Amino acid sequence: MKKLALSTLLLCGLATSVLTAQQAAPVDRPAEPNLVFDDDGGKVQIVPADLSTAGPKTFHGGPLLRSAQQVSIFLGAGWGDQQFRSREASLLDVGATAGDPHVSELKKHNIRTLRAMPRLEDFSDLSRARVNDLTIQQKLSDLLRSKAIPEPDAGTVYVIFLAPGIESTLGAHRGGVDYAAYHNFVNLEAGEIHYVVVPFHEDAERHSSAATRAFAETALNPNGQGWF
């Protein structure tokens, strides 16, 4: 009888411990749709891997970009391969995509899309380790410090296209599995930097669509308090 009672107490204790651990575990993502936590705990808006939308956007009282101008950064050794490099032309100015509903939404909010700035190709080999958001921020800082890319003005959006073979992560989330693209911002010596990260996708149309949507969402929700 004593053994039965002891076993029951042990089972109850185990169940309580499991429940407590589950309750104490951090929430993997914010309550808002299409937002996740990044590597330092901030909220980041993603384009889901299936490109699904979350319904009508709601305004949260914050600023929008008055204009948006793309600066493309083709990052990774894979872009040096001609079969992939030829795709760059279709990605250089996603804000000029005719008939795209996300670009049309910018016009609805009187956000101008300016002609894209010249691209930068950086063929660094980043295939041996995961590239997280902090890696991206450090790369932007290095490129700005070396003047490899133009310093930002109020409407600059750096769009970073990752080469095939690069494994992108954002907090606990994986590029191509949990998101097709995302946008974020960071304060560096050059000022407030708005940027988009687009993991490579074999399907050129989906690749371009993800980049276009993330670019538009950057202008509509640059600091996390706009339209989303």
Kindly label every feature range from the protein language model.
Residues 141-150:
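Short, well-structured alpha-helical segments in soluble
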